[in-house]
A protein has these predicted regions:
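N-terminal chloroplast transit peptides
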Residues: 1-37
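N-terminal glycine-rich phosphate/pyrophosphate-binding loop and immediately adjacent elements
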Residues: 54-200, 517-518
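A conserved FAD-binding loop/helix module that cradles the flavin
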Residues: 109, 544-567
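A glycine-rich dinucleotide-binding beta-alpha-beta segment and adjacent secondary-structure elements
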Residues: 248-263, 424, 483-548
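Helical element adjacent to the flavin cofactor pocket in flavoenzyme catalytic cores
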Residues: 274-338
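Mid-domain catalytic core of redox enzymes
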Residues: 288-289, 316-437
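C-terminal segments that line or cap access tunnels to active or ligand-binding sites in enzymes
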Residues: 394-501
Length: 581
């Protein structure tokens, strides 16, 4: 799941909320947009029917997830010849969608901000800005919570949450939840400002970093007093500032988990500061791309192609080619035997574990620092996975003000990371009717990275044992959807359940994992950096298995990192004039 946050001011190229439908808020105005015309197959889905032939390029990117597309499109924008090869028949990776009988089912992110209005500090929004690819969005500011305290509507961008706290959350040991929340908001202001002081688009690892970072020095100096806090786990911030009310602490645990796939003890305070600022500044909004997550993928694919890049689907990489004498990555070999020679770089958007599998035996260990990198990869913890429930339902008689997002937590005492304890529900057709047939809704419910991988190891898809476990483990998803639509089972016309094995097979992900985790702990004495580099010359890795882990902003930041390892610093400076003025 992605909390892709940022919705700054009025200046930007995106259509206004009025052009796309009324903003959803306290007035509870439903989205009355005309049904979007059915389009021809998207750029993200159209693939060459002929097998990819051997050729030479500057950069080859393995995998067309958002991280890979960002890296490839930016590299093409900087003038590189780029070929992106994707094993699947559709681009997008964890953000891909699929269609059945007029429904568009989404497999991944559903919660966005900072994608459409420019300038923005969202790394993915900055990529779209760099590519001159506007992203039409529907704007809204409400979502529904089904928590142990009760079910209630909450808003971003104002103090409505204070009213919710006063109504639903009692005092505990003399601590008032509403007052504690207002105190926390004040404490978070310097944290939020510091978190936005240095955009990933400014970073590079060579000596010219002094040039690209120079314009951000004043902001970094202003943030200096809180830098130790933003580079520590957020749990330490809560402890230091004596945030004691159980509900406020639990709510921040939810936000941390939505953002990073980890609890507060495993989430950098910088990450939560960035998101907190985005959600709770006055008049903030969330965004839903018209066309769903696929619209982001299409925009990145357009940006790649219009700058001369190639996107080759159904093109499975069998191995990374490495020069035996120099130890440099020189290209890839596809399953059909074709070879793509990369004069400058191979960028892998496969997970680090899967990337290691397609390197020649001992190739990484043979280069300086390679042993340590292999050890680090093998020791990187895997996030848990997902259970997915995809539904197409009859919407007759459902209220016009049905919310797009619902969050369900069963038991605070178990913790938000506990298996089967937290579910997210997205009803995307509430805001974009084109995603379902007339009079229908499409629903995606999922456990956000809390499904244990080990439960599924050794099972074979399609067996009775597998089907029984799918039914058992998807029951909580049905319960969560029933919180939003009590009679949903009577309305179902299409129903599909996905498991970690689904993710492992269709997304070719190591064990079906959601990504990497475990870099941040309360006893850490060092903090990793966001970097696409590896010890092997010419090989870069991007995606959610690298620090800081899952999320659209995180993987887009890797795209910037990889592109700027290859681009001249003066072109990067020109780009910063545009995306981070």
């Amino acid at each position: 799941m992605s909390a892709a946050m940022r919705a700054p001011g009025a200046r930007g190229l995106a259509p206004s909320p009025a052009a796309l439908g009324a903003r959803r808020g306290s007035a509870r105005a439903p989205f009355h947009a005309a049904r979007i015309a059915r389009r021809r197959p998207s750029l993200a889905r159209r693939a060459a029917r002929a097998a990819v032939e051997s050729h030479e390029t500057d950069v080859v990117v393995i995998g067309a997830g958002i991280g890979g597309l960002c890296a490839g499109a930016l590299s093409a924008k900087y003038g590189k010849r780029v070929t992106v090869v994707e094993s699947h028949d559709v681009a997008g990776g964890a953000a891909h969608s699929w269609k059945r009988d007029g429904y568009t089912f989404e497999s991944g992110p559903s919660l966005y901000s900072g994608m459409s209005q420019w300038p923005t500090t969202n790394p993915c929004g900055q990529v779209l800005h760099a590519l001159d690819e506007p992203l039409p969005c529907v704007y809204y500011n409400t979502w529904m919570c089904h928590l142990p305290e009760g079910s209630f509507l909450t808003e971003v961008g104002n103090d409505q949450f204070v009213d919710v706290l006063k109504r639903f959350v009692p005092d505990v040991d003399g601590v008032n939840a509403a007052q504690e929340w207002l105190r926390l908001k004040t404490l978070m202001k310097p944290l939020a400002a510091a978190s936005s002081a240095l955009p990933p688009s400014a970073v590079r690892t060579d000596a010219f970093a002094a040039v690209t970072l120079a314009r951000f020095v004043p902001g970094l100096l202003a943030a200096a007093p809180v830098l130790p806090e933003i580079m520590a786990p957020y749990s330490k911030f809560l402890e230091k500032n004596e945030i004691k009310h159980p509900f406020i602490k639990n709510w921040m645990e939810v936000l941390c988990f939505l953002l990073s796939g980890a609890p507060a003890s495993g989430t950098l305070a910088a990450e939560i500061g960035y998101m907190f600022d985005d959600w709770y500044r006055p008049n903030s909004t969330l965004e839903f791309p018209v066309g769903g997550s696929e619209a982001i993928v299409e925009a990145l694919a357009r940006g790649l192609r219009k700058n001369g890049g190639r996107l080759e689907l159904r093109s499975h990489v069998e191995s990374v080619d490495v020069d035996g004498a120099s130890g440099r990555a020189t290209g890839v070999t596809l399953r059909n035997g074709s070879k793509i020679v990369a004069k400058e770089a191979v960028i892998s958007n496969a997970t680090v574990w899967d990337t290691l599998k397609i390197l020649p035996p001992n190739a990484m260990e043979s280069v300086k620092g390679g042993d340590d990198w292999v050890k680090e990869v093998n020791e990187t913890k895997t996030c848990a996975s997902f259970m997915h429930l995809h539904l197409g339902i009859d919407a007759a008689g459902l209220p016009d003000d049905l919310e797009i997002h619902h969050i369900y937590v069963a038991d605070w005492d178990r913790g938000v990371t506990a298996e089967q304890n937290m579910v997210l529900v997205s009803i995307a057709s509430v805001l974009d009717p084109s995603l379902a047939p007339e009079g229908k809704h499409v629903i995606h419910a999922y456990t956000p990275g809390n499904e244990p991988l080990e439960l599924w190891q050794g099972l074979e898809r399609g067996t009775p044992e597998y089907e029984r476990l799918k039914e058992e483990r998807s029951a909580v998803l049905w319960r969560a959807v029933e919180k939003a639509i009590p009679d949903v089972r009577d309305r179902v016309e299409k129903s599909f359940v996905g498991s970690p094995l689904t993710q492992q097979r269709w997304q070719r992900r190591h064990k079906g994992t959601y990504g990497g985790t475990g870099w941040i702990t309360e006893d850490s004495d060092t903090i990793p950096i966001t970097s696409a580099t590896t010890p092997m010359d010419g090989l870069f890795v991007v995606g959610d298995s690298n620090f800081p882990g899952p999320g659209v902003p995180s993987v887009a930041a890797h795209g910037w990192s990889a592109a700027h390892e290859l681009a001249p610093f003066w072109k990067q400076c020109q780009m910063l004039d545009k995306v981070a003025p």
